[in-house]
């Protein structure tokens, strides 16, 4: 797994590229899909996004690529600054990296990362997608945040543990092959 700062940054980049696409489309289709289609009467979520001229974000319609880019920048910054370092520290408080089987330790890191990143990114999403046309109310923001955490946490936990992280670890191992050292 990552051994230096460059490799950690690349690992975070690979993770965020896959994760952001998964969560943006999960959010659009599963969390907000029925509401979006009810607004315009479109028969599909993509048809609705086309009819509206984008996705409502920060009080205006933004093209889907803008949504992915904004969430990518937020997620990468959070992952590098908070997610990876804090999740490793949290996992190290429970398990000793030297004495624990690598699969168990990596699972602990994934669980800690989801536990930190899901509420943080859900809060950012609550701010980004807040219905500003109704005015701003802190209680509404907090309620939207809690709703997003409840929707996103199970999806985040299972996709990270069983799909995204195994995929990223396999890609990372292929990209950064280690030459076995002989003694």
Locate each region found by the language model.
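Juxtamembrane/disordered regions of integral membrane proteins
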Residues: 1-183
């Amino acid at each position: 797994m990552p051994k230096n700062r460059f490799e950690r940054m690349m690992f975070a980049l690979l993770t965020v590229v896959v994760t952001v696409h998964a969560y943006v489309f999960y959010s659009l289709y599963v969390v907000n899909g029925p509401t979006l289609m009810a607004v315009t009467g479109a028969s599909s979520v993509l048809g609705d996004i086309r009819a509206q001229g984008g996705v409502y974000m920060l009080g205006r319609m933004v093209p889907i690529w803008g949504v992915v880019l904004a969430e990518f920048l937020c997620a990468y910054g959070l992952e590098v600054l908070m997610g990876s370092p804090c999740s490793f520290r949290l996992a190290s408080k429970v398990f000793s990296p030297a004495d624990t089987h690598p699969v168990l330790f990596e699972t602990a890191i994934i669980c800690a990362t989801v536990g930190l990143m899901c509420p943080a990114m859900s809060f950012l999403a609550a701010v980004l997608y807040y219905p500003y046309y109704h005015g701003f109310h802190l209680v509404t923001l907090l309620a939207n945040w809690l709703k997003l955490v409840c929707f996103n946490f199970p999806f985040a936990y299972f996709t990270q543990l069983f799909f995204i992280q195994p995929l990223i670890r396999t890609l990372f191992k292929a990209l950064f092959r280690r030459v076995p050292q002989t003694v």
